Amino acid sequence: MVNIIEQLEKEQIEKLTADRGVPSFAPGDTLKVNVKVIEGNRERVQAYEGVCIARKNDGLNSSFVVRKISYGEGVERIFPLYSPNIASIEVVRRGDVRRAKLYYLRDRRGKSARIAEQTTGHSGKVAAAERADAAAVKAAKVAAAKVE
C-alpha cells in the first residue's frame, strides 16, 4: 500500500517539475521565489527574496521557509516546494552554515544576522550543473516548438 502511495507521489512530483525545475538549495542560501499572485481577474508574478532558514523534505509535501526583513520587520513565509503557485525558484547566493534550521536568526539584527557566503568548489560545480540542466531543458523546449 505504501509503495503505491510513494509511486503516485513520485509521478506527481515529476509532473509538477516538468515545466519548471527545482534547484538544489539548502538553509542559509539566499533565494528569489517568484510567486503567482491572482488579483481579481489579473495574474502577476511577485518576487520574494530572502534567506532560506528551514527546509522540510517530505516528498510531495516538501516545503521551505524564507525570511526577509521588510521595512524593519522580519517576515517569514512558508512555501510548499511543489506548489503550482510558484513560478520559479532562483538561488541568488549560497550560504555557509552548520545548522539545518536557522531559527536563531529570528532573534538577530544587523551584522550578527549575516551569513557567510560559501566559497568552496562544490557550490560552483552545483551552479554549473544547474545551468547545464536549464540549458538542456530550454533546448528541448525549442526543439519541441520547431516540431510543432
From Swiss-Prot:
Gene name tied to this protein: rplS
Species in which this protein is naturally found: Paramagnetospirillum magneticum (strain ATCC 700264 / AMB-1) (Magnetospirillum magneticum)
KW Thylakoid (keyword) present: no
PROSITE patterns in the record: RIBOSOMAL_L19
PANTHER family: LARGE RIBOSOMAL SUBUNIT PROTEIN BL19M, RIBOSOMAL PROTEIN L19
Family as reported in the entry's similarity comment: Belongs to the bacterial ribosomal protein bL19 family.
Lineage of origin: Bacteria, Pseudomonadati, Pseudomonadota, Alphaproteobacteria, Rhodospirillales
Membrane-spanning segments: none
Superkingdom of this protein's organism: Bacteria
Gene Ontology MF terms: structural constituent of ribosome
A Pfam family hit: Ribosomal_L19
Keyword Hydrolase in record: no
GO BP, one annotated term: translation
Protein name (Swiss-Prot/TrEMBL): Large ribosomal subunit protein bL19
Reported function: This protein is located at the 30S-50S ribosomal subunit interface and may play a role in the structure and function of the aminoacyl-tRNA binding site.
A GO CC annotation given for this chain: cytosolic large ribosomal subunit
Keywords: Ribonucleoprotein, Ribosomal protein
